[in-house]
Structure formats: C-alpha cells, structure tokens
Swiss-Prot record:
Specifically methylates the guanosine in position 1516 of 16S rRNA. It is found in: Cytoplasm. Gene3D superfamilies: Vaccinia Virus protein VP39, YhiQ-like domain. It catalyses: guanosine(1516) in 16S rRNA + S-adenosyl-L-methionine = N(2)-methylguanosine(1516) in 16S rRNA + S-adenosyl-L-homocysteine + H(+). GO terms for cellular component: cytoplasm. One of its GO terms (molecular function) is rRNA (guanine-N2-)-methyltransferase activity. It comes from Neisseria meningitidis serogroup C (strain 053442). S-adenosyl-L-methionine binds at residues 96-97, 168. The lineage of its organism: Bacteria, Pseudomonadati, Pseudomonadota, Betaproteobacteria, Neisseriales. Its EC number is 2.1.1.242. Belongs to the methyltransferase superfamily. RsmJ family. Keywords: Cytoplasm, Methyltransferase, rRNA processing, S-adenosyl-L-methionine, Transferase. This is Ribosomal RNA small subunit methyltransferase J.
C-alpha cells in the first residue's frame, strides 16, 4: 500500500476523501520511493528526492488546453460519440481521457484499481465539480475504485452493458516532453506492472455493446497481439477498435 503524509493544513474534506482508500498514514515522508501528500485542499503524488509533484487538475495545463482548444477529435471519432453515449473507461489512471470523453457529453464510468491513483483522481474530480469551468464535465464522470475486469461483469447485471469500453494500458513511449516523462516516471514507479492485457481485452469485448476502443502509440504493437477490426490513426496516437464477441459491426 502507499504511504500518505497528512499535513496540518489538510482540510476536513480532503481528510474524509482519503479515508475512502486503503492508504497508510505516516508522520514523515519515506526514505525512498513515492508517497501521497495531503495539504490544504489537494492530494498530490511525490517522489522522494524530487521537488515537483503530480496532481489531477482538470482546470489547468494540458486538460485546460484540450478543453478550450480542442484535441479530442480523434477519440471522438473512435468512440463515435454521437451514437454511443455511455463509456466505461477501464484504465482511468489520472483521468485525462475520461475527462475528454465526458467533455463530449458522454456518461463515463471510470475504473481505477490502484488506491493512490484512485485517490488522486477522486480528488481531481472533487475539485473539478467545484469549478464553474469544469463542473458540468466532471458531473459526467462516475469513479469506481477497483479492478475493472472484476467489477464490470457485476455492474452489467445492475446497469446493463455500456456502448463502449475504453482501454489505455500503460505503454512506454519514447518521444515525450521532459514534464510528461517525469510524470510518467512517478506513475510507473507507483503503479508497477501493468494488468493482464489479454484478460482485460477479453472482458472488455464481453462487456461492450458496440465497440472496444484501445489507445496506443501510433507505431505501437496491438494490445495482447490481437489485431483490431479497424483503427483511427493520428500523428502520435492510434485508436484500435475491437468489436464485441458475436458482432460484425460497431
């Protein structure tokens, strides 16, 4: 489990939020590795020996740029957002793609199994709901803490199948800005090994009603070595589309 250092300045709202996740409260940072820091109104991810931190902030940075300047055109085509209103993001991570999908007006159910990452994302969604510029989009995201492959079958029984299951498994990309490389370093050290890709894709194809959309680097291998039905390719990113079992179109 991940350590969390709770500063004296942490608000009661933040303290309540972090109690929802199996984290280990500590009185000082660990000697090495990563940890969460709760201070003021924010939860951040820190790496021992580094000054910078990672937070989920949908109102600034890359998230703000994509929200105000666009940048979701390819993903919109891949999910066919006008025809498929419900999406389950089975690999939510820090929620960037969940937020883009929600900004398209889709109802997004986001799954994140790592407690520290889920805590960061939950905190980011909470703050986005308080910001007039992001609250409408954030309201379209419903976060589930747990393993998507384990939770999706049960959720289908109560909510029915989603139109789309979206996957963005971790993938080592070479051409990254220094800031993104540092953030991914934090993230990889925290999360460790990726999920069983074949099992995840199998469950996704059992779950989706219309299609499974997998985000990959433009020149990256197919997920679990399985060729998609078709794909949408951009300058640096590719979206592979798989059809649910027993269907021939999505």
């Amino acid at each position: 489990m991940t350590d969390i250092l709770i500063d004296n300045t942490a608000t009661e709202t933040v303290r309540t939020l972090i109690r929802a996740f199996p984290l280990v409260p500590v009185s000082q940072p660990p000697e090495q590795g990563s940890y969460l820091l709760a201070e003021h109104d924010t939860v951040s991810l820190r790496l021992v020996g580094e000054k910078s931190s990672v937070i989920v902030d949908f109102a600034s940075g890359a998230a703000q740029y994509r929200r105000t300047k666009g940048g979701g055109e390819l993903i919109a085509k891949a999910v066919n957002h006008t025809a498929h209103p419900t999406v389950w993001d089975a690999t939510a991570g820090l929620g960037r793609d969940s937020f883009v999908l929600a900004s398209l007006g889709l109802a997004v159910t986001a799954f994140e199994q790592h407690p520290a990452v889920a805590c960061l994302l939950s905190d980011g969604i909470r703050r986005a709901l308080l910001n007039p510029e992001t609250q409408d989009t954030a309201a379209h995201i419903n976060l589930h803490f747990g393993n998507a492959a384990e939770q999706m079958p049960a959720l289908v029984q109560t909510q029915g199948k989603p139109d789309i299951v979206y996957l963005d498994p971790m993938y080592p990309e070479r051409r990254k800005s220094a800031a993104v490389k540092k953030e991914m370093t934090y993230f990889h050290r925290l999360v460790g090994e990726a999920q069983d890709e074949a099992a995840l894709l199998h469950t996704a194809r059992q779950t989706a009603k219309k299609r499974v959309v997998v985000k990959r680097p433009r020149l990256g291998e197919h997920l679990a070595g399985q060729a998609p039905a078709y794909q949408y390719t951009g300058k640096s990113t590719r979206f592979d589309v798989y059809l649910p079992y027993g269907t021939d179109k999505g």
